[in-house]
Amino acid sequence: MLISKKTLGVLIPDIFSFSNDQIAQKLEQMGIEVESIKQFNSPDYLQLAKVVSIQPHPHDNKLFICELQIDKNKFINVVSNANNINNPDNINKFVIVAKKGTELLNGLIVKTQNIKGIISEGILCSYIDINPFSRQIIEKTEVADAIIIDHVSNDHDWNQYLSFLSLDDVIFDVKTPTNRADLHSLIFLAKELGVLLKTKTFLKQKSSVVNHDFFKFPLNLKNKLKANYFGGLFLRQINQHSSPWTVKGLLINQMIKPVNYYVDKANLVTVFTAQPIHCHDADRIVGNIELKQATHNETFVGLDDKQYEIEPGDIVVCDEKGIIALVGIIGSKRTMVQPTTTNIFFEVVNCNSETIKQTAKRFLINNFASKFMVKPISLLATDNCLNYLQNSLLTTDNIGKISHFSSSLKVEPFSKKLTVNFHKIRQLIGIEKKELTDQTIKKSLSQLGFKVDNQLLKIPSYRQDINTWQDISEEIVKLIDINKLKPIGITSSFNFEKSSYFNTFNALTKLRKKLQTLGFHNVITYQLTDQKSAKTFNLFNLENFITIKNPVSQNHSVMRVSLIDSLLKVLKTNNNYKNELVNIFEFSFIKTQNNSELHLAVLWVEKLFTSSFNPMQGISNDVFTMKGLAKLIVANLGFSCDFEPLDDSDYFVNNQSLKIVVFNEQIGFIGLIKESLLNNYDLNNKPIYCLEINLDRMLSSLNRIEKNYLGYSKLQPVCKDLTFSFTNPASHFDQFANMIKRITGIESWKLISVFETMQNNQLITKYTVRYFLKNDANKPLTNQTIELITNNLKLQCEKLKIKLDI
């Protein structure tokens, strides 16, 4: 979930007086996990400019010469091909200009240019020029449009353009607790956050327009599903236009695609209330409108131009011609709001979330609406939605154009009652009465929306997570901050002993951080799986599986004996939801009836250290880099490893897989997964390398390692670097490794870099090796000896047709 600080500022006006870290701390205190805080980095030399004149280019009818005022007495000419610039109404409006010397985020450096005989001293910026990462969210028609700003105050600093695009915003990327669907609503979230920040909140939005003049809702709606609510508002005789860039920017910041003025308003209302709204062109609706469950198979075309196969049981909204919306998922193309639309029906539904969840899962959809509708939505959230929508539409231009609600919604403010004992709450928290009085508890709960009558507590209707008095204790802890509670030691009749040799937890923590630094993402998956999956990727040939008696489902009936299958299912799920695939790893115990051992598994899917500006950059996944990764993991635990061939594997491609061996004992595998297996996970479109290691055998050996310490040599170590590539594609790095071991005078070597580069229009993989020469105190190295060793190494490389970078 993305939280915009500027959007939150509508409900908590003082939010900008708090630092981002303070807000993040309070969100964490609420039980919300803050994953990242994002701010926009603006390029230098961008500023607002006033359009003075627009003239056609004398030599190209697709270009226009714009005279711009960039300061009180400074003017420049800019040649532009923006689709929307040639309009007399743009005179005296403002644009954003990138002046000479600007380096845009897409890598473009702006220079003064002669464009067909006219000097251009900059470029008019489109939104993509300033924020290239939003390309997938912007309408295609706006990609080539210049940003036009209607009005800028006389005292505004023209160098400060970010606020007009809402790029001065801060975005908190968060995860809400699974039992707090209400926190998807910014209104409910702001209520709690305001209490923790000890500042005022304004949760009821009211229009400044006094004369409402609402008309009777004109459509005939039938709630055949008997849903909690089915209805909405009607807006008539409107003129369609785009939203201002301040609104578009807010939506883009939260990964919502701007559409037009009224649809954007509805989407912002959804952000505030967590109640999705479908917008329909009312003139395209035929006859009565029904909310119902589909009774037979049928198809309809959605807003995204895709055909959807509706099955019996799916919840749909229909008119007399057919389906106009798949509830909580997507509207139909037939009734979508278009530039010519003059009458809009804003449809709001509150119904069974479980059915919508199953439908969304079948269609592999995880869009803006379904994220909210797959969880229960309180009636209070629906009521907030209707009121926010009506007030947001209520402008002086729309007086007499907005209907009453189609039907009234009766909302009970409180859903249940609990009897609480304040003394028990203090005991559970571990705090004295003088530190937390009864009055303080009552005041705190009242601020959070609870109604307190002595020890009888009324629970707000949107708080479905509150069921026992212990849940109330959790609410109190949030307010007093759990970090401020004094720790109380655990009384025990025995002492915990800490190993003086090694701390396994620290070793694994260090290894986890190392993998995360390299760009791998830590995941946690289920221990239980089905019979078929349990036998897939049984790399260690384990037997005596643990089976569950009376399992919840057959999909969770057996304890897994490998982590690879679980990780591939993670990639499959993300791939189905069109999420970008990343490299992942997991630590987990593999349990059988005989044993329990700690394993580490890694899936390498994409290049490491890539750049969005240079896709060629990065380290590719191949068997050589997998060997390096395996060595790094084993070395992190204080061991070294060797590799042995793996023949006729059921899981890996031949010549692309190896056994990992430590002290002549096989501890794991690396390899390229066979495409036939990846077909089962819908992942056969790219190579996936995997690694699985039994860490238990190494960890149990750590305390019995004997170490020999050698004194430092008085002689300075001698090392040299060598960069090379293979001229023969069939060559292997192992050929170089075997050769360099045989060179007299070379004590050791290590691979320090692998990179790809273009050479003669061909992608070449290059390797850089650092080798160390023996420098014996009895026979120190001379320049002549070093040269002999180096020349011998070069000669051996030539024999193997290894091309050196000299």
Swiss-Prot record:
GO terms for biological process, alphabetical: phenylalanyl-tRNA aminoacylation
Chain sites annotated for binding Mg(2+): 465, 471, 474-475
Cofactor needs: Mg(2+)
Entry's Gene Ontology cellular component terms: phenylalanine-tRNA ligase complex
Key words of the record: Aminoacyl-tRNA synthetase, ATP-binding, Cytoplasm, Ligase, Magnesium, Metal-binding, Nucleotide-binding, Protein biosynthesis, RNA-binding, tRNA-binding
CDD domains on file: PheRS_beta_core (cd00769), tRNA_bind_bactPheRS (cd02796)
Domain B5: 413-487
One MF term in the entry's GO annotations: tRNA binding
Family affiliation: Belongs to the phenylalanyl-tRNA synthetase beta subunit family. Type 1 subfamily.
Protein name listed in UniProt: Phenylalanine--tRNA ligase beta subunit
Species this chain originates from: Mycoplasma genitalium (strain ATCC 33530 / DSM 19775 / NCTC 10195 / G37) (Mycoplasmoides genitalium)
Gene that produces this protein: pheT
